[in-house]
């Protein structure tokens, strides 16, 4: 990686880290695990930076994070460890109730199967289209739609007091 590439990489990392860390947190449900996931994905992305700089480096990094997390879930399942993370970080009361809804949504996301959780994160937190999600996950648009439908149905069961917006393609 030459000096020009290093400068572009540093600029990319500085500008996109907050958004990508949010995705990592939503995938893992844990701040420390999110940091590890992001750093691991970034380490795998840097050697390919020269070829990515003109394409979609953020999309590539997001896909690497997703695949790394799926590998972790699979290893966890093989060991038959079931570990749900505990307490959310302490927050001040939000008079509008927005914080409570966000915390409830984070907790509910942890109860979704990994594939459904990932689709929800990419569709609604990252605001990707169904086509973009399908490309990132290496599946069909129909699969994205069915996972989204099942995930939203489950979230409605888990959060009966939270009004979820209608899901549209």
List the predicted regions and their residue ranges.
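Short, charged helix-capping/linker segments at alpha-helix termini
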Residues: 1-11, 21-40, 48-55
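Structural recognition of an alpha-helix C-terminal capping motif at a helix-to-coil junction
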Residues: 36-43, 47, 55-67, 146
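Residues within helix-turn-helix
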Residues: 32, 131, 142
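A short pre-motif secondary-structure segment
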Residues: 119-123
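Residue-level preference for hydrophobic side chains embedded in well-ordered alpha helices
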Residues: 12, 16, 20, 41, ...
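Short amphipathic alpha-helical boundary/capping segments
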Residues: 9-11, 104-113
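Arg/Lys-rich amphipathic alpha helix in sigma70-family domain 2
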Residues: 63-84, 97-98
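DNA-recognition helix of helix-turn-helix
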Residues: 137-161
């Amino acid at each position: 990686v030459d000096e020009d590439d290093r400068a572009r990489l540093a600029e990319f990392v500085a500008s996109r880290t907050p958004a990508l860390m949010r995705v990592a947190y939503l995938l893992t449900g844990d701040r420390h695990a999110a940091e590890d996931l992001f750093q691991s994905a970034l380490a795998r992305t840097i050697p390919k930076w020269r070829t990515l700089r003109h394409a979609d480096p953020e999309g590539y990094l997001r896909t690497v994070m997703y695949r790394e997390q799926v590998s972790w879930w699979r290893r966890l399942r093989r060991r038959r460890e079931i570990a749900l993370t505990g307490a959310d970080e302490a927050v001040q009361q939000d008079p509008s109730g927005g914080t409570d809804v966000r915390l409830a949504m984070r907790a509910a996301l942890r109860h979704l199967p990994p594939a459904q959780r990932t689709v929800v994160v990419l569709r609604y937190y990252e605001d990707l289209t169904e086509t973009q999600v399908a490309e990132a996950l290496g599946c069909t648009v129909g699969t994205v739609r069915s996972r989204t439908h099942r995930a939203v149905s489950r979230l409605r069961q888990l959060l009966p007091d939270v009004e979820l917006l209608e899901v549209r393609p």
